[in-house]
Every structure is written in structure tokens, then in C-alpha cells.
């Protein structure tokens, strides 16, 4: 990772821009988490306790999930190699799970319900994702697509050229989407004066968009053949949100939601295979992908509105 990441020098010490953006994102996330805690009138010390737990648990879970699901790492797996986290190798989903675990532990210690903290967590998380994904622009390998074969896209600002091929800057799209979600949740909380309902809504929106972006990524990060392991985890995220929304509308809707999830899973595998192995235009395939993922997103929003819940 060191050879592939842009560095800077400060007071005689070497720093890395990617790490700086991750740290900036973490700081923004914790600041907004504290702000939303104040708006929700959480118990004194809740935000401080969460902050103390979140960073170590986020790093730990991110590293552990990477070590478990990155198949290239398995060939050199050892406890010593797993502990050498400073050389790179982290999972975004693992970081989110670590933050959720920190929120749950905080709720247990403070003897308060966990759900309000998880709502606050989901509303603040896009700030971290936005900055962390932007930081990938200072690496050579993270956050880029397969080689582009569409001239107008290859010559746009969304493309990165390495002298041989042009690649889509997927990290830019992810950062922009996370930024939009951060603003959306901030405006939503400001209007409603509560973060209630943010958890499921965030799982639905973040899960569907990240499932698409993980498909666009082709950086060998946590992949098995043409399938991204993180894509599967993000798909589980939006599927869980969809089914929970459906449960509020009756058992019949749960069956429909499960059927839709199965349909989307089958369609996604088929599209992934075609993207990886066929000569069909990637633009057409990704247009179909967007329509496919719009199905659970739209259905989830419909169930949310129908159930008249936050």
C-alpha cells in the first residue's frame, strides 16, 4: 500500500493522504453524531462514550472482516499478518459493523434503548463514507472500474488514465452519493427534530447504491471471481431493510419482499456474469442494473409510506 498511496511530510513525519481523509471523515462523523445526540436529548456522556468505543471497534471489525473475506489474503494468513493493519487491508462494511457494535455497547452501558443511537449512527455515517471514498483518489488501485471502452466517458473528468487504459473513478460517485445522503439526513433531522427512522431508511438507500458501486469497482478488493463480497453484504443490508418495512404492512407483503429480494439476487448474479464475461455493452448492462436495484429501493419506500412510520 505504501508504494501506491500519495504521501506528505509534516514536521519530519510521513503521512498519507488516504489516511488523512479517513481521519477527517471520522472526525466529521463523530461531530455530527454528537450534534444529533444533543438534538435527541441523549443521556449525558453518550456521545463521548460512543466516540471512545467507535474508533477502536471500527478499525478492529474492518480489519477482521477483510482478513476473513479477502481470498488473496488467505494465502498468507497468519495472526501476525492480520495484526499488521498499518500495511492496508480494511473493509468498509466492517467499519460500519464496528460502529454499530459501539452504539449497541454504549446503549447497554448507558442503560438506554439502542435503536435511537442506531438511528443517529446511520444519519451521521455518510459523512465518514464521503470523506473516506474521496481519499481513495490518492491511491492507485482502490475505487476504480474495469477499463472503459466508451470514448465519451473515458475522456471525461470521471475517468482516470494510467497510460494504458482509462478507468471510471468509482470512488467519486460513491463520495458524491454519500455526500447527498449526508445532506439529506441532516435536512430531514433538522425538519423533524429527530433522527427516528434513519436506520432502516439509511440501510435501504445506502445498501442499494453501494451494491451498484461495488459492482463498478474492479480493484480485486475482497472479490471472489466476479463477485464482490462487500456487494453481498450491502445487498443483505437493503434486503433486511426492505423485509422489515414490509413486516409493518402484513405477512403477505413480507412474502412479496422476500420474493423481490430473490429476484434481485438472481438478476444481479446474471448481470455480474454478463458484465464480466460477455461482449454486451456495459452501459446497457449497468442501465439494467440500476433498474433492478430501483425495484427494492422503490418498494421499500412504498412500504415506508404505506405503514405511515418515520
Map each language-model feature to its residues.
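A feature for loop-to-transmembrane-helix boundaries and adjacent hydrophobic helices
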Residues: 1-310
Amino acid at each position: 500500500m505504501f508504494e501506491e498511496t500519495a504521501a506528505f511530510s509534516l514536521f519530519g513525519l510521513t503521512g498519507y493522504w488516504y489516511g488523512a481523509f479517513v481521519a477527517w471523515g471520522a472526525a466529521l462523523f463523530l461531530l455530527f453524531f454528537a450534534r444529533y445526540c444533543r438534538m435527541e436529548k441523549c443521556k449525558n456522556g453518550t456521545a463521548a462514550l460512543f466516540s471512545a468505543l467507535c474508533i477502536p471497534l471500527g478499525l478492529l471489525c474492518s480489519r477482521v472482516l477483510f482478513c476473513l473475506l479477502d481470498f488473496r489474503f488467505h494465502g498468507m494468513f497468519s495472526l501476525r499478518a492480520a495484526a499488521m493493519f498499518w500495511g492496508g487491508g480494511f473493509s468498509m462494511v466492517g467499519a460500519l459493523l464496528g460502529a454499530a457494535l459501539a452504539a449497541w455497547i454504549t446503549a447497554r452501558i448507558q442503560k438506554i434503548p439502542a435503536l435511537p443511537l442506531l438511528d443517529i449512527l446511520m444519519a451521521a455515517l455518510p459523512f465518514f463514507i464521503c470523506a473516506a471514498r474521496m481519499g481513495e483518489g490518492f491511491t492507485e488501485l482502490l475505487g476504480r472500474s474495469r477499463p472503459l471502452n466508451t470514448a465519451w466517458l473515458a475522456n471525461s473528468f470521471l475517468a482516470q488514465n494510467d497510460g494504458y487504459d482509462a478507468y471510471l473513478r468509482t470512488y467519486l460517485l460513491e463520495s458524491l452519493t454519500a455526500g447527498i445522503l449526508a445532506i439529506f439526513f441532516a435536512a430531514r433531522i433538522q425538519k423533524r427534530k429527530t433522527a427516528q427512522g434513519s436506520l432502516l431508511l439509511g440501510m435501504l438507500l445506502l445498501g442499494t447504491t453501494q451494491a451498484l458501486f461495488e459492482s463498478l469497482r474492479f480493484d480485486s478488493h475482497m472479490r471472489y471471481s466476479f463477485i464482490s463480497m462487500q456487494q453481498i453484504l450491502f445487498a443483505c443490508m437493503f434486503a433486511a431493510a426492505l423485509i422489515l418495512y414490509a413486516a409493518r404492512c402484513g405477512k403477505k407483503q413480507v412474502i412479496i419482499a422476500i420474493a423481490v429480494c430473490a429476484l434481485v439476487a438472481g438478476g444481479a448474479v446474471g448481470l455480474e456474469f454478463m458484465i464480466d464475461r460477455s461482449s454486451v455493452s456495459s452501459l446497457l448492462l449497468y442501465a439494467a442494473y440500476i433498474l433492478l436495484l430501483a425495484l427494492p429501493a422503490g418498494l421499500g419506500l412504498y412500504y415506508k409510506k404505506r405503514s405511515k412510520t418515520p
